[in-house]
Regions:
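Glycine-rich beta-strand-to-loop/alpha-helix junction loops that act as flexible
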Residues: 9, 91-93, 209, 323, ...
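Short glycine-rich, Thr/Ser-proximal phosphate-binding strand/loop in the N-terminal lobe
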Residues: 12-57
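Short beta-strand-loop/turn "lid" adjacent to the catalytic site in phosphate-handling enzymes
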Residues: 71, 75-123, 144, 150-159
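Adenine-nucleotide phosphate-binding core of ATP-dependent small-molecule kinases
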Residues: 266, 273-277, 284-319
Length: 402
């Protein structure tokens, strides 16, 4: 079964074509600057060179057709015709409370995704555009949507409710939803496999650390808490996002800085985080280089970030009544041995620690704890596209018997 996996952003489309017989990636690609000057498709057949196609891409409909044309191109394509695509799997950021699992696309599902757009105004509309574009191009091919929020729908009320009047939850759905669910789900399953069991056997803390970062408590296969909240702004200090702050800072900014709601949103989402603390960059590679040169604020930004992650590890260990494994994933979690080491400093009380030699791992699944550790520590590259493809196959086989 061949699955076309699509992730549509506001001005981009990422895609993979995966043969699920062996879970082999046949090709992947990225279209950038949709609706802008200088748009480009970077298409990479597995094991071959990347093809750059510079062409105006006015919208997602055109972009999806361009991607499929690349897949069937006689020179750099990997299938002979579009009819070889058996199903399409889409990433959708926010499913609200309506969607607690991946689903086959119907008219009701499309309406539901649109209704959740107010919860993710930057993400759900382009996600929906991608679904509609694929439906128009391949009307007979089943479409499945996989929600970032779905994995966290197993959180209990005590974890997802805020200390606000209950009416806000009833009227507007104001609660913790959590994000990066597809990534947290994948790496928890991989960690369990590496420990020789099922994910339902273990208590695992998953740390998805990149420009956007979150931590999740996965207890016996189910998410029981996560750091992001009603929006992806909550929780950890991130690249440009503040993470959790005292809510009274917002009226303070209104009075002292004469900010309106839009300006505050910009301030907290795009000018804060390690960028705001360092005054230099949101890229941890830049911060580490500057810190090595003696830049104190860059070092401070790194320290604040690592400390917040460590706090969540401690909190989620308590919430689960213990922990069997800690997993680092995403760009920073997978690739920064120094950040993993800093976060894990002082975890000896859990009966674990980082092995400096094993911790040099990059780009592959690796156990990085000291020998004999009671709590395993892993660095695991995430693979959200594979989770989307797996869910797509499972739903298609269960519902339409493909």
């Amino acid at each position: 079964m061949i699955v076309f996996v699509v992730n549509c952003g506001s001005s981009s489309i990422k895609y993979q074509l995966i043969n699920m017989n062996g879970e082999k990636v046949l090709a992947k690609g990225l279209i950038e600057r949709i609706g802008m000057d200088g748009s480009v498709l970077k298409h990479t057949p597995e094991g071959k060179y990347t093809v750059d196609i510079n062409i105006d891409v006015p919208d997602h409909n055109f972009g999806i057709k361009l991607a499929v044309d690349a897949l069937v191109n006689p020179d750099y394509g990997v299938i002979k015709s579009m009819s070889e695509i058996d199903a399409v799997g889409h990433r959708v950021v926010h499913g609200g409370e309506r969607f607690s699992d991946s689903v086959l696309v119907t008219s009701d599902v499309l309406e539901g995704i649109a209704a959740c757009a107010e919860l993710a105004p930057l993400h759900n509309p382009p996600n929906l555009n991608g679904v509609k574009a694929c439906m128009a191009l391949m009307p007979q091919v089943p479409q499945v949507v996989v929600f970032d929020t779905a994995f966290h729908q197993t959180m209990p009320e005590k974890a997802y409710l805020y200390g606000l009047p209950y009416e806000l939850y009833v009227k507007y759905g104001v609660r913790r939803y959590g994000f990066h669910g597809t990534s947290h789900k994948y790496v928890a399953q991989e960690a369990a496999r590496m420990m020789g069991g099922e994910v339902s056997d273990y208590r695992i803390i998953t740390c998805h650390l990149g420009n956007g970062s979150s931590v999740a408590a996965v207890k016996y296969g189910k998410s029981i808490d996560t750091s992001m909240g009603y929006t992806p702004l909550d929780g950890l200090v991130m690249g440009t996002r503040s993470g959790e702050i005292d809510p009274a800072i917002i009226p303070f900014l209104i009075v002292k800085e004469n900010m309106d709601a839009e300006q505050i949103d910009e301030y907290l989402n795009r000018r804060s985080g390690v960028l705001g603390i360092s005054g230099l960059s949101s890229d941890f590679r830049d911060l580490e280089s500057a810190a090595h040169r003696g830049d104190e604020r860059s070092q401070l930004a790194i320290d604040v970030f690592a400390y917040r992650v460590k706090k969540y590890i401690g909190a989620y260990t308590a919430a689960m009544g213990g922990v069997d494994a800690i997993v680092f994933t995403a760009g920073l979690g997978e690739n920064s041995s120094s950040m993993r080491e800093k976060i894990c400093e002082g975890l000896e009380y859990l009966g674990t620690g980082i092995d400096p030699v094993k911790n040099k791992a990059r780009g592959r699944n690796q156990e990085i704890n000291v020998d004999g550790a009671k709590v395993k520590i892993f660095a695991i590259p995430t693979n959200e596209e594979l989770v989307i493809a797996r869910d797509t196959v499972n739903i298609c086989r269960r519902i339409i018997k493909l």
